[in-house]
A protein has these predicted regions:
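Conserved P-loop NTPase motor core
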Residues: 1-561, 610-611
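Hydrophobic, well-ordered secondary-structure elements that form the walls
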Residues: 433, 481, 722, 758, ...
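Short, Lys/Glu-rich amphipathic helical modules
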Residues: 428-441, 618-619, 671-675, 817
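Extended, charged helical/alpha-beta scaffold domains that provide interaction surfaces
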Residues: 32, 306-313, 319-326, 528-529, ...
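Short Cys/His-rich zinc-binding micro-motifs
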Residues: 806-825, 829
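Active-site-adjacent structural elements in folded domains
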Residues: 109, 417, 801-803, 811
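Generic detector of short, well-ordered, non-transmembrane alpha-helical segments enriched
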Residues: 376, 429, 477, 605, ...
Length: 830
């Protein structure tokens, strides 16, 4: 087998390459150790000079790793082990380094981060929360500062100036959420100097599976512009609560989909007084009903969300942490609020959005590290073009992983778990109990209280003391009940006495749908060669077992007298559980892949719009571009009147003139001026007249103001239509799956119709830019004229810079600018 591995196993070949380089780095150790602190620091400038003179990162890699390794020892007293060098090389190569818990991923990242920061293009280190970002920046940051590099931390509460400084640092620590929101905000600014990011170069994502897999289905959204809909959610909720399963609605355990059956459809039509529920005019009603069904029958309180202070707070299904400030999209959050009887927030309009999949694929080089990635390596390779390299442990793993204990019922399982905890607690062995849901952790806690066993509970309702609770979880006699949140971030360290007692005992109360999450729980025990054990207890009533049909096995065991309190350890049943997990993982991968295919459609559009915005912001003047827009619009205007035979009739010319004289020109053109002219000549004549009047208007205004004026109008038009387009695409996406009933591929239909909508949007943008710029007047006061001349000063004797005041001429039949939706003549123009 080893012979075949040498030729066909990518991971094996990469590790062999890394070992050769790691040997060279280790050989340099005696030389680097002899350098003084000053000589070691000077190496950074030497490396930068060599890069400037044409050498590449591969040429300085061995020396740079050796320097970073020695600096770590001098600054924090820790020198990366040989296996950590291997991990660092995997990360530098744009791979994922899979390193077991306690193997020192944080220290491992310092070597590739230092090497890549030498280019001056910036390195971003992403963590899952701000606590870890600050901890790692303060801890590892001292190594980089010692070597002459700058280190920044980007927080949610940082000011724009602080964010700019952080992004301009050689190495920046931040969270995946803040990175994404900064990207979206940068593409909404109206001045170039307000952007905080620079081009995305190299990123190291800590807990990469959490960011790129678990959160891949959750888009980042910046929203605004409120929509009134609270009563509709209440009405839909009332209706949904009247229905019964299989007698009004159907619930699919495997997919968690809830749909109306025939009876439910008829009841909906009666309740809401509509003839045909699925008529196109009832699209919104169907949406509210569907969300109410999902809220009431698929979303579980204290598992998917908690209710706190009149608010619905989402529970992260993979970490168990509360996600304050996050809302379910598409009205599901409001539907849950209606279900729970809390205040219903107003729905908002999406202003900007992106998925983590497309955000991180914008980096020149993407890498990561985690303890659990191997089960998802196909997805990492296919979506992100990253390989998972499993790094050997520094010491052999001494933890004992036992096969699953299977019980008939949950009640029997929980009793057995409490008895096991009691036995281990009496021995003094620390126990970590892993649960999936808040309600399970609270149930186990109440049973332990009755048994008079002291313990700590760590769940979404009680996460303020997370670091403290986890740090003490390895003490003698400690019993800790935790949701999945205990899986990341803080090591559980053991005393010698606890090691003698067998180390940390990990008990899982049920299998998660992802093997990776189970492996994370196991990995809390047995760090760096410590002793320990792990055991999962499952029952036929667990969600995973119910979803994947284990009724036949349950019946068989019942026939042979398998009672509630008896457990069995059966390899065949354990394999069937793992097979069920693989099916769920495969299904989830397909969902994420499908999401990406749809998101790629709007991502191409987003890239063009954002590129156009940045060109506008970075240009000194966009006047030539504005004139091109005028020409495009006038050309489209004329083309839209051309007869199929390829000419313009007198009637067509009259229509073009009527529109032009009313909307584009102050000085009217006559039909005679256009008669007997070719289509190109008509276009050019109209264009020349529009330009003549427009240039005349601008000639009366100082050049600096006209530059600002054009930029402000163009950006406002682009942003307005782009935001509308995002919501239009979202609406298209919501119903596109119905096309499959007509034998039409939904993705192909979404792509085709999405680009038609996009083309329409671009044409509308050209039209509105033309209209706004031609119709707008710029008023300036005396102070503004003085500003342009550099004369106006404020109390501190500094020149003031004001923004141009733009006033639009509004036609009486145009929408009122107050946002009421009425015509101007029927609203503010009365």
């Amino acid at each position: 087998m080893k012979f075949f591995k040498k030729f066909f196993d990518y991971e094996y070949k990469e590790l062999e390459k890394f070992k050769k380089v790691a040997d060279q780095i280790m050989e340099l150790e005696p030389v680097i150790e002899k350098l003084t602190d000053e000589e070691l620091k000077n190496k950074t400038q030497e490396f930068k000079d060599r890069l400037t003179n044409g050498e590449d990162l591969e040429g300085i890699k061995v020396e740079a790793f050796a320097v970073a390794r020695e600096a770590a020892f001098r600054v924090i007293g820790e020198k990366p082990y040989y296996v950590q060098i291997l991990g660092g090389l995997a990360i530098h190569g744009g791979n994922i380094a899979e390193m077991k818990t306690g193997e020192g991923k944080t220290l491992t990242s310092t070597m590739p981060a230092y090497l890549n920061a030498l280019t001056g293009k910036g390195v971003h280190i992403i963590t899952v929360n701000e606590y870890l970002a600050e901890r790692d920046a303060n801890w590892m940051g001292n190594i980089y500062r010692f070597l002459g590099l700058t280190v920044g931390i980007n927080f949610r509460e940082s000011t724009p100036k602080e964010k700019q400084e952080a992004y301009n640092s050689d190495i920046m620590y931040t969270t995946n959420n803040e990175l994404g929101f900064d990207y979206l905000r940068d593409n909404m600014v109206v001045r170039a100097e307000n952007r905080v990011q620079r081009p995305l170069n190299f990123v190291i994502i800590d807990e990469v599976d959490s960011v790129l897999i678990d959160e891949a289905r959750t888009p980042l959204i910046i929203s605004g512009g409120r929509i009134e809909s609270a009563n509709l959610y209440i009405d839909a909720d009332r209706f949904a609560k009247k229905l019964k399963e299989n007698d009004g609605y159907i619930y699919d355990e495997k997919t968690k989909a809830v749909t109306l059956d025939e009876k439910g459809i008829k009841e909906a039509e009666t309740c809401f007084k509509v003839e045909n529920l699925y008529d196109l005019n009832n699209t919104n009603l169907v949406h509210y009903i569907n969300q109410a069904l999902k809220a009431n029958y698929a979303m579980k309180r204290d598992m998917d969300y908690v209710v706190s202070d009149d608010k619905i707070i989402i529970v992260d299904p993979f970490t168990g942490r509360l996600m304050a400030g996050r809302n379910y999209s598409d009205g599901l959050h409001q539907a849950i609020e209606a279900k729970e009887g809390v205040t219903i927030q107003q729905e908002t309009k999406t202003l900007a959005t992106i998925t983590f999949q497309n955000l991180f694929r914008m980096y020149n080089k993407l890498s990561g590290m985690t303890g659990t990635a191997k089960t998802e390596e196909e997805e990492f390779r296919e979506i992100y073009n990253m390989y998972v390299i499993t790094i050997p442990t520094n010491r052999p793993v001494a933890r004992q992983d036992y096969g699953d204990l299977l019980f008939a019922t949950k009640e029997g399982k929980y009793k057995a778990i409490v008895n096991e905890i009691k036995e281990r607690h009496n021995m003094g062995q620390p126990v970590l109990v892993g649960t999936i849901a808040v309600e399970t952790s609270e149930l186990i806690s109440s049973m332990l209280k009755k048994a008079h066993i002291p313990h700590e509970v760590l769940n979404a309702k009680n996460n303020a003391r997370e670091a403290e609770i986890i740090a003490k979880a390895g003490e003698k006699g400690a019993v800790t009940i935790a949701t999945n949140m205990a899986g990341r971030g803080t090591d559980i360290k053991l005393t010698d006495e606890v090691k003698e007692l067998g180390g940390l005992c990990v008990l899982g109360t049920e299998r998660h749908e992802s093997r990776r999450i189970d492996n994370q729980l196991r990995g809390r025990s047995g760090r760096q060669g410590d002793p320990g054990m792990s055991q999962f207890c499952v029952s036929f009533e667990d969600d995973l077992m119910v979803r994947f049909g284990t009724e036949r096995a349950k019946d068989m065991l019942a026939r042979i007298g398998f009672s509630d309190d008896v457990s069995i350890r059966n390899k065949m049943l354990s394999n069937s559980i793992e097979a069920a997990q693989k099916r769920v993982e495969g299904n989830n991968f397909d969902i994420r892949k499908n999401l990406l295919q749809y998101d790629d459609v709007i991502n191409q559009q987003r890239e063009y719009i954002y590129e156009r915005r940045n060109e506008i912001l970075d240009s000194d003047s966009i006047h030539d571009s504005v004139l091109d827009t005028f020409h495009n619009y006038i050309s489209d205007l004329v083309s839209s009147h051309i007869m199929p035979e390829g000419y313009l009739t007198d009637n067509d010319l009259s229509e073009i003139l009527e529109f032009s004289n009313e909307h584009l020109l102050k000085k009217d053109l006559s039909v005679e001026e256009l008669k007997n002219k070719s289509i190109e000549e008509v276009t050019e004549l109209l264009y020349s007249k529009v330009i003549e009047e427009y240039e005349q208007k601008l000639s009366e205004i100082p050049e600096e103001i006209t530059k600002e004026f054009e930029k402000a109008i163009v950006l406002r038009v682009i942003d307005t239509h782009w935001m509308d387009h995002i919501n239009t695409m979202s609406n298209l996406r919501e119903g596109i799956h119905l096309r499959s009933y007509a034998q039409v591929d939904p993705l192909r239909a979404y792509t085709s119709e999405g680009f038609e909508l996009y083309d329409d949007m671009l044409n509308t943008i050209d039209k509105d830019i033309t209209m706004y710029l031609i119709k707008s007047e710029i008023r300036q006061n005396v102070e503004r004229k003085q500003v342009i001349k550099g004369e106006a000063v404020n109390d501190n004797n500094k020149v003031k810079k004001a923004t141009p005041k733009v006033v639009n001429k509004i036609g009486r039949n145009e929408p009122c600018p107050c946002g009421s939706g009425k015509k101007y003549k029927q609203c503010c123009g009365k």
